Curated annotation (Swiss-Prot):
Family: Belongs to the RNA polymerase alpha chain family.
The organism of origin for this protein: Lactuca sativa (Garden lettuce)
Segments for region (Alpha C-terminal domain (alpha-CTD)): 263-335
Reactions the enzyme catalyzes: RNA(n) + a ribonucleoside 5'-triphosphate = RNA(n+1) + diphosphate
Main location (coarse class): plastid
Stored InterPro entries: DNA-dir_RNA_pol_insert, DNA-dir_RNA_pol_RpoA/D/Rpb3, DNA-dir_RpoA, RBP11-like, RNAP_asu_C, RNApol_insert_sf
Primary gene name: rpoA
Protein's UniProt name: DNA-directed RNA polymerase subunit alpha
Record carries keyword Transferase: yes
Length: 335
């Protein structure tokens, strides 16, 4: 077995890219290290960076399609091989890169027979397509396909509300996440007193892993800057205030709860994004308000299978992670 060797700084905290690869235009990979870190620091940074990479970076997606030929999402159009639903799913997969703020319009206008691909989308100059070969539809007859598109830049994901089809326009569930997956690992040295943080990043091509690392770091810094101010700022918020009611709370109440149920609190403090779940499973759980290990254990395998877009393979993967990392299991049914 050949062990990998890397050169790290002995004093100054430094980062560098130790590996990069392009599997395709829509799948880029990068591996980075940060060192030297004191014991415990690598995990602190790694968890925060993974969450920022998956949830804090903006992406550009097609969010709505409009055509007079669409009667409903699962209809078919004479002369087009794919159903409307399949066309919408193909549009959802188009990877875009932009300097867009908010939303803009685009369109498709093609006459068959022939294949409709991403290169047939007419875009504003500040939006570009990463892979022009991405398939949209197959026209089998000499018909004209005209589709109006709405493009949006945002972060995270959006779920369309039911029954939102109107005037030949249909929303597309966008996933504004340029980072497909992110993992972190830790290598200890000097008798466990020093650590090297390894970050692995996979992107959809709209950002390179290095660009994603920069964006995530900048967003984290922006969130923490207010804490660097030595005094609380009394901003003039007249006309822009919102009162949030809070439940009664004392230190002793909190201490009593911690003492009473230490195991429950421990499970509640472990967030699901610390479990190296794939982004798709992670997002499905978040949509069902499952954020911690305690939330997850309050559900059975049967409950998970009732969630939208959840598959038996996803449940098996969760069971494997729970067994490997926490030596616990999910019941098949609620008792």
């Amino acid at each position: 077995m050949v062990r990998e060797k890397i050169t790290v700084s002995t004093r100054t905290l430094q980062w560098k890219c130790v590996e990069s690869a392009a599997d395709s235009k829509r799948l880029l990979y990068g591996r980075f290290i940060l060192s030297p870190l004191m014991k415990g620091q690598a995990d602190t940074i790694g968890i925060a960076m993974r969450r920022a990479l998956l949830g804090e970076i903006e992406g550009t997606c097609i969010t709505r399609a409009k055509s007079e030929k669409i009667s409903h999402e699962y209809s078919t159009i004479m002369g087009i091989q794919e159903s409307v639903h399949e066309i919408l799913m193909n549009l959802k997969e188009i990877v875009l890169r932009s300097n867009l703020y908010g939303t803009c319009e685009a369109s498709i206008c093609v006459r068959g027979p022939g294949y409709v691909t991403a290169q047939d989308i007419i875009l504003p100059p500040y939006v570009e397509i990463l892979d022009n070969t991405q398939h949209i539809a197959s026209l089998t007859e000499p018909i004209e396909l005209v589709i109006g598109l709405q493009i949006e830049k945002n972060r995270g994901y959006l779920i369309k509300a039911p029954n939102t089809f109107q005037d030949g326009s249909y929303p597309i569930d966008p996933v504004f996440m340029p980072v497909r997956n992110a993992n972190h690992s830790i290598h200890s040295y000097e008798n466990g007193n020093k650590e090297i943080l390894f970050l692995e990043i996979w992107t959809n091509g709209s950002l390179t892993p290095k660009e994603a690392l920069y964006e995530a770091s900048r967003n984290l810094i922006d969130l923490l800057i207010p804490f660097l101010h030595t005094k609380e700022e009394n901003l003039n918020l007249e006309g822009n205030q919102h009162m949030v009611p809070l439940p009664p709370f004392t230190f002793y109440d909190k201490l009593a709860k911690l003492t009473k149920n230490k195991k429950k609190m421990a499970l509640k403090s472990i967030f699901i994004d610390q479990s190296e779940l794939p982004p798709r499973i992670y997002n499905c759980l978040k949509r069902s308000n499952i954020y911690t290990l305690l939330d997850l254990l309050n559900n059975s395998q049967e409950d998970l299978m009732k969630m939208e877009h959840f598959r038996i393979e996803d449940v098996k993967q969760i069971l494997g992670i729970l067994e490997k990392n926490f030596v616990i299991d999910l019941p098949k049914n609620k008792f």
